[in-house]
């Protein structure tokens, strides 16, 4: 059995790490490179960086900080933000990123997933899915351009359908960003995760809702996710990664101990 992964998420805007609640009202957390080094030193298995306004601004992630991060950490990291072409992805990977993640550009052009997977290998291609539960319809819908609340829109896709499409297109991993839970720290949406797990054949990463160590345990034990991504509990030092991993190991979760 592959070890489960603990993945801090760093949302980047204007060259700094920020964090919001339900993708809104972002506050500045700090500088990118020191935070990345801190999480690597604490025992994170990998890091994810989202340039949250790149797609809505029509630009690609700023590559300068990607190179600086690569110089100070020795764990894998993934970068997302406005990647629309093989050339965009190649440049980010050349600066030291191990994976690239696409989200809104994949919704605009699903063939992008296949082209990137064919060029760089499926193990390098992550698809992020921003999913919102609509109380009125009782369904989960995929949202696009979520980094800019003035441009965020609900797409035609129901989440489970889009999960299956991106796998067919060549996604090597899926990060499920559960918007209702984002930053609230009330736990991951286990109901949704279980539904997605049933149709997801590639590694599945849960994102949105972690507030306690027990929430991570529930995601691994009850929804069988491959990794758990979190931000605010790490940024605000509510949970220490080393202590979290020791707790999970004590609960029988297969995990890499620092």
UniProtKB/Swiss-Prot annotation:
Q: What is its EC number?
A: 4.3.2.10
Q: Where is the active site?
A: 11, 130
Q: Name one GO cellular component term.
A: cytoplasm
Naturally occurring in which organism (per UniProt): Salmonella schwarzengrund (strain CVM19633)
Q: What is this protein's record name?
A: Imidazole glycerol phosphate synthase subunit HisF
Associated pathway: Amino-acid biosynthesis; L-histidine biosynthesis; L-histidine from 5-phospho-alpha-D-ribose 1-diphosphate: step 5/9
Q: Which residues form a coiled coil?
A: none
Q: What enzyme category does the UniProt record give?
A: lyase
